[in-house]
Amino acid sequence: MSEVEHQELDLNGEMLARREKLAKLREQGNPFPNTFRRDAYAEKLHAQYDEVEGEALKEQDIQVKVAGRIMLKRVMGKASFFTIQDVSGQIQLYVARDNLAEGVYADKVSMWDLGDIVGVAGTLFKTKTGELTVRCSEVELLTKSLRPLPNKVQGLTDQETRYRQRYLDLISNEESRRTFMIRSKVVSGIRQFFLEKDFIEVETPMLQVIPGGAAAKPFITHHNALDVDMYLRIAPELYLKRLVVGGFERVFELNRNFRNEGVSVRHNPEFTMIEYYQAYADYHDLMDNTEELLRKLAIDILGTTTVPYGEYVFDFGKPFERITMHDAIVKYGNGITREDLDSFEKSVEIAKGLGIEIQKSWGLGSVVNAIFEEVAEHQLIQPTFLMAHPAEISPLARRNDENPEVTDRFELFIGGREIGNGFSELNDAEDQAERFDAQVAAKDAGDDEAMFKDEDFVVALEHGLPPTAGEGLGIDRLAMIFANAPSIRDVILFPAMRQK
């Protein structure tokens, strides 16, 4: 018999034993009651009483009611020690036969297994080793666990188990619980930041007839009642800018986007973004906003502006570097000159030398962008704003007044990864229509990620969009940074996984 077969046999035997215990408990009453009300949490009890001496604690006679999942147990005849875990942490219980009503220890406590959820009432005391413990006078099984907790290898280090059965990961892995607490703080901190700056939070369609706002491949579905193909949105941008046209001068949406593309340590097809738009502002204002936001998040979440991430330490306390795409290529491109990047033929030659496959639809801007991604992107470790992107790859961004070949756009890079994208918005309806037409031509030439033309959005621009700047920030990638998580799957509770 193989090791796997032995494990399955052991699991089946364990589950059978637990079901037999559950059957006996049912004979005594409902083994899944809903009447227990706790008044204390493990973390707060430790914070308040860990430093109190045992005698002083005894004199205070502190009564508590706690509940949680059994993580450890030590049975010593007529008494047992259990460690239970609630949302805040763990605390030890001392359950002795003589401290309970007659028959409770033998008939009920003896049925407790690892993974069961229990509620107890009792008095705080310190053990001989000084551990804060609840001496239980009342106990109640709240939920019988029919499956045993995973062992250490399965529960804490096996990635498949962690991602597919996140509930087991959260039970077993304190670091995972911390990661998702940090993610929650990132989301709430961002929302509060924009609300305090008088932004209005809005919701725009997830199902769209025309997917727009980003260069990406969408998911397609069909609306039966309307008999029309629809798309899961790739970005809320065009709807949010319609709202600015309508007079909402500061809007944001914190929600999901969907892109039918690859899965990697940086990409999940379903992801969360904050996208915001501010009238009477430009892309410089948004870069300032972004610095302020990330600095505040670092302090509020970690208590410092220096954030460790893998082999790096990011410094959010210093002004972020600001560099143009062309200057970044020259800086890191090992001999590439600005004159090279102004020539389509020379840029194509450089790109091919770097092993880049040139697409038929590419102009100079796309080639320059591909060169940047190859030679410079991974070099932008400390928080850096990359600016002045070619107009060809920025169909929704305003052209720069001094050099119309580039746009008033920036991308935020941290650790060599793009975290955000923003720009002064294109509010010239005629220019926007022409750029949409160029995107349609690229799509017809085989570019799956080229944008669709949104005629209604052009009509909205014809009514007048005030000078506006907008930005999108990836929540998942920010959570990765603040939680020091190497993969996007580590910060998404239920990431996309290939079917078994």
From Swiss-Prot:
Alphabetized SUPFAM superfamilies for the sequence: Class II aaRS and biotin synthetases, Nucleic acid-binding proteins
EC number(s) reported in the record: 6.1.1.6
Catalytic activity, as annotated: tRNA(Lys) + L-lysine + ATP = L-lysyl-tRNA(Lys) + AMP + diphosphate
Binding-site residues for Mg(2+) 1, renumbered to this chain: E411, E418
One GO term (biological process): lysyl-tRNA aminoacylation
Annotated cofactor note: Binds 3 Mg(2+) ions per subunit.
Protein's name according to its UniProt entry: Lysine--tRNA ligase
Organism: Actinobacillus pleuropneumoniae serotype 5b (strain L20)
